[in-house]
Amino acid sequence: MQPPDTELRLLLLTSSYWPEHSPPQRRWTSLITTLCDQGWAVSVVAPVAHYGQGPDYNSDTKGHAWRVQHGFLGERIYRVPHLLLGDNRIFKLANQVIGAAGSVLRGVATGRQDAVVVTAPSLPLLGSALLVARFKGLPLVVEMRDAWPNLAEDASLVRGGSKSVINSAVEYVQNRADLVVTVTEGFARTLRERGVANVVTVRNGILMDRTPHLAAPPFDRERLEVLYLGNHGESQALDVLIRAAALVGEDMRLTFVGHGSQKPALRRLAMELGVNVRFLPPEYREAVFERYREADSLVISLRDDWKSFEDTIPSKTYEVLAIGRHITGIVRGEAANVLTEAGEGDIVGCKPQEIADLWRGLVADRGRLQPAGSGRAWVQHNAEYSDLACQYSELLRETIHEHRTHPPQSLGRRIARVGRAAVKVARNARSVRRSA
């Protein structure tokens, strides 16, 4: 096995990266911070920045197609094209295919590496990573950040014949990966039950030294301040929060911070019900902590009618646990288990009346808003990104060592493997189009 002080080179393929503000960006900029200290040189292949414009986003930092950027962590960023086609599912898929094709071309021309990591759920990008790894003769690490394709089935993104085709395509790549990484134990267990080998869990987390512990909220506040900060999409069932706030009335104020496809509909619902809801744009860094500071209870929410969410933990969970605020947990499965194990918050069902009953209880007894204090210690022990990055580094080194124990293949053999993989990926893509 390579000693820790030996520099190794990692190639990361992702659909979103800095200066965007997105789940893969937050995860990987946090991991890369420590990986570089662990002796890794990291190259990133990603589309021109276009989504979730973070605080560093501008015409220079977003990058240009086929150009190379030097990231602020010391990584090299290789940009591939992204076309502004539109926001519907067809256009999104088209852009994924374009980005995936560009990732193959760029990925094979990034110099020498020791391993390829792809962070999913983009199906086309999974195929790209397999092709790049085969061409360069490198081990492939597939990171499944969501319970996918289960989540796609729950959201009706795949139907009919396309369902089995997409499942087969994902399993094809997973079964040929040298290592599969999940962010929850539940989904890792699901993959093992399907026969996927070499599955490990490296959960999401936070950097504790950048996450303050806030003083308790005041006891004499006139109304309950409830905050949801995050994506406003179909997955979160945020309309239930508005309906619950309508039942509570003037004793509380609900604040939404962020953006997403459902935000216009949520605004309309709040107006129709006459609810005191404050809608704010996305906020970053210190502004987020100030928003937490003015809140009494922070909401973590996932809809309860998608089975895949039993194996899903919203990435904000760890930050909310560490910050020192009461948690309204509208979650089940593994996310609920984390809150229970950490000893923080109240878990309620995804029903307006249940949520309203909880909030009325908090209004009546503000002493319940005082966190137990065990959440931050739990995060320090289980979800500190510097520790998770060390775990990831060791797994990558073991995977590289195992891959190198096999006799290297000639370039001709590698090209033949790429050809076979490309044919399989192309067949799956055609099958998906015919089934759609």
Go through the PLM ranges and name each one.
Residues 48, 186, 204-205:
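Carbohydrate-associated surface elements
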Residues 101-108, 124-135, 161-182:
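Membrane-proximal helix-turn-helix segments that form the acceptor-binding/catalytic region
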Residues 1-69, 246, 415-436:
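N-terminal subdomain of nucleotide-sugar transferases
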Residues 236, 284-291, 298-318, 326-338:
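Nucleotide-sugar-dependent
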Residues 223, 252-257, 264-290:
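Nucleotide-activated donor-binding/catalytic signature segment of Leloir-type glycosyltransferases, i.e.
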Residues 350-353, 366-397:
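A charged, aromatic-enriched C-terminal amphipathic alpha-helix characteristic of glycosyltransferases
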Residues 218-236, 242-245, 255:
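Conserved donor-binding/catalytic core segment of Leloir-type glycosyltransferases
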Residues 95, 136-139, 150-172, 208, ...:
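Nucleotide-sugar donor phosphate/pyrophosphate-binding loop at the beta->alpha transition
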